[in-house]
Amino acid sequence: KNADYHQYFIHFPPTDMRMPRIYLGEILLHWCDTCHVPVLSGVCACGSPTRPVAVTPPGDARPAFPDDIERINRIFSDHFGAPLIPEGHIALLNKVPAADRMDEIVLGGAVVGAVRYLPGERRWEPLPRRAAAAYMRPTRRRVVVDDGAVPSIRDEGASVLAPGIISIDPAVAAGDEVFILSANGECIGVGRAKVDAATAGAMERGVVVRTRKNLDAAPLPGEATWEDTVRANEPVLADYEAASIRFVREAAEQNPHTPTISYSGGKDSLATLLIVLKAIGAVPILFSDTGLEFPETYENVDEVARRYGLEVFSACDKEAFWETFEENGPPAVDNRWCCRVCKLHPVGRLIEENWGECLSFIGQRKYESVRRMRSRRVWRNPHVPQQVSAAPIQQWTAMHVWLYIFREKAPYNRLYERGLDRIGCFMCPSSDLATFAIIGETHPELMKMWHEKLARWQEKQGLDPDWIESGLWRRQGSSDEEEEDSYN
């Protein structure tokens, strides 16, 4: 219904280059085949041993919310004629390094596929693994091969050759992802078509499908709920909670400054807030109001403050961003002046006016980025010398955070249910283009306004016509270094 949004951001297609693996910590995700739930240790609370889930590093998987599941099922149904994720099954998404955004899909303790956003085509692409056949029966984009071809394809990952094909779905185009089936309907592999169906039908020899390597991991389907998942992880959550509470108490004892919570409206700062409340009781909330927050974020800050009886100190300079924009243009991943101008400096002034100095507990986690992985757990930001920052959940994964929030029945930002995995400013240059596409659907008025601002700067500076369309506004130089604000 917001298809006109795509006129604002039309981007170069991603390359198929292999992305580097990023290890930020031990991958803790396991699966209990007895309870059919993810578990963050080698033993489930039910007493059963668990098995590791082979997700791509950094392995910071999260729950798939209903909107995520609806989107994935729509993508698979449009392409293969059948949805992937059945009702009542626990599904996880694991963001992996990609040219834009790519999420692995975990079902039954195995990665059964992925979805990848293709900005140049303004669509999501399904990337199934053979394991997906445990959950779906494709009716489109299928290639059926004779019995003689089955062993080499299934066991050795051989390509599908023209002589071995019994039938190919007429919808298959060159470059499409396809399921490869035996004559009796068994899925023996998946891959990418090298030619379209018509061409394949006329071929006497040659490769029709380049098969993707079959991986050993097999899912074990079974229904469960998130309440079941929380119960299965109770020993883990109790241990992580206790360690974080000890950290908060020690940090408060060693720093004489007024303790506060830096709250952004995101999941990590919410989990941190819950820990701090249990450790040392009610403390003030520091909220950095940039003027660029989502409406849902303001609602969440108010709801959290009411629920837990906390006073909110808001650092607000809503004109600072646009004044700096008029001089410098938009912020970029390698020049995030927005964090200094709209967050750090106003927060510093707020602290100085109210307490002189303070201790702030911040929802930083090492699984978020290389810089945060290397960060100390207690530090001072040079842009906010009035603030000592401390990170109680530095060792937590996103699954620890979500299961803890579910366990505590805490009011989280509902934007997470709309497909966003990180909550910040709506036009953050660190966002991938898939995120902007989602925001264009959920908040079209915000993205329309942002495009108009970019267009005026583009005209004023005489920038290349593709400066907006290609997403070049998000980067000023050629460096891959991304500035961190160290403030959640």
Range-by-range predicted roles:
Residues 4-262, 270, 274-283, 290-293, ...:
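RNA-binding accessory domains that recognize and position tRNA/RNA substrates
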